[in-house]
From Swiss-Prot:
The chain crosses the membrane at residues 27-49. It holds the Pfam family ATP-synt_B. GO terms for molecular function: proton-transporting ATP synthase activity, rotational mechanism. F-type ATPases have 2 components, F(1) - the catalytic core - and F(0) - the membrane proton channel. F(1) has five subunits: alpha(3), beta(3), gamma(1), delta(1), epsilon(1). F(0) has four main subunits: a(1), b(1), b'(1) and c(10-14). The alpha and beta chains form an alternating ring which encloses part of the gamma chain. F(1) is attached to F(0) by a central stalk formed by the gamma and epsilon chains, while a peripheral stalk is formed by the delta, b and b' chains. This is ATP synthase subunit b, chloroplastic. It comes from the Eukaryota. F(1)F(0) ATP synthase produces ATP from ADP in the presence of a proton or sodium gradient. F-type ATPases consist of two structural domains, F(1) containing the extramembraneous catalytic core and F(0) containing the membrane proton channel, linked together by a central stalk and a peripheral stalk. During catalysis, ATP synthesis in the catalytic domain of F(1) is coupled via a rotary mechanism of the central stalk subunits to proton translocation. Its main location: plastid. It is found in: Plastid, Chloroplast thylakoid membrane. GO terms for cellular component: chloroplast thylakoid membrane; proton-transporting ATP synthase complex. Belongs to the ATPase B chain family. It is a single-pass membrane protein.
Amino acid sequence: MKNVTDSFVSLVHWPSAGSFGFNTDILATNPINLSVVLGVLIFFGKGVLSDLLDNRKQRILNTIRNSEELREGAIEQLEKARARLQDVQIEAEGYRAYGYFGIDEQRHESINSTYKTLEQLENNKNESIHFEQQRAINQVRQQIFQQALQGALGTLNSCLNNELHLRTISANIVLFGSMKELTD
């Protein structure tokens, strides 16, 4: 606030005409001083400002160029992605159609396989039953044969006495002897 009041005071109080100097008080300066300051600023600041503006312009142009390249790359990638998406959708549709066909085919194969397995199980069951029947029949035959043999042996043992036994042995010896002579 003091600077503002000093400025107004300096407006009221003009310096003496014989002095020469640089007046920093902007309200107390004359147009010549202002034009000198502005001329110096324009002369020296023009190159700096021009360089700054040129650099800024180049950076903006480079940024625009890079953005255009990135945009073109993004558009190209987008087109590739769309083409890939379309290929994948076609492939997925093919898999879906093949999947439905495959599922139906697998269902038929599974049903046929189940029927074949059931037939094999039925055949195995029938073979097992037949085998068990044959085994039971063979066991019964063997038991009947053993009982018949035991009965025959019992009958022979009870019917044979020593004399009949000796005559049978003698007859067999004679029979074997005659067979031996025929073969010699």
